[in-house]
């Protein structure tokens, strides 16, 4: 892959989601990431495989509605968030936490 293509793939993945449900899914070899809301499943798969050198078996995505926030009398919307649950091949792992 070219460096330009890899740098664009790095922008697809924003951060890992660390919740109790996502941590329990690690036992099933499923990792949850917050991704760009415009990213499609093939782009997410290519980004995960290129950045972490793993084989992706399946991807589930969810695009929940934006939440409304108020500050005083002003009302606004929070930024759009898309989550991707990525299932990896048997034997592949992503190092999310440093080992101690």
UniProtKB/Swiss-Prot annotation:
One of the early assembly proteins it binds 23S rRNA. One of the proteins that surrounds the polypeptide exit tunnel on the outside of the ribosome. Forms the main docking site for trigger factor binding to the ribosome. PROSITE patterns: RIBOSOMAL_L23. Pfam families: Ribosomal_L23. This is Large ribosomal subunit protein uL23. One of its GO terms (molecular function) is structural constituent of ribosome. Part of the 50S ribosomal subunit. Contacts protein L29, and trigger factor when it is bound to the ribosome. Disulfide bonds: none annotated. GO terms for cellular component: ribonucleoprotein complex; ribosome. Belongs to the universal ribosomal protein uL23 family. InterPro entries: Nucleotide-bd_a/b_plait_sf, Ribosomal_uL23-like, Ribosomal_uL23/eL15/eS24_sf, Ribosomal_uL23_CS. Keywords: Ribonucleoprotein, Ribosomal protein, RNA-binding, rRNA-binding. GO terms for biological process: translation.
């Amino acid at each position: 892959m070219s460096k330009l293509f890899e740098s664009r793939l790095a922008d697809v993945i924003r951060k890992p989601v660390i919740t109790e449900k996502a941590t329990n899914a690690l036992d099933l070899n499923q990792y949850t990431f917050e991704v760009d809301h415009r990213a499609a499943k093939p782009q997410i798969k290519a980004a995960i495989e290129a950045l972490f050198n793993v084989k992706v078996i399946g991807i589930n995505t969810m695009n929940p509605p934006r939440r409304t926030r108020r500050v005083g009398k002003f009302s606004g919307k929070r930024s759009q968030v898309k989550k991707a649950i990525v299932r990896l091949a048997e034997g592949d792992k992503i190092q999310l936490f440093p080992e101690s």
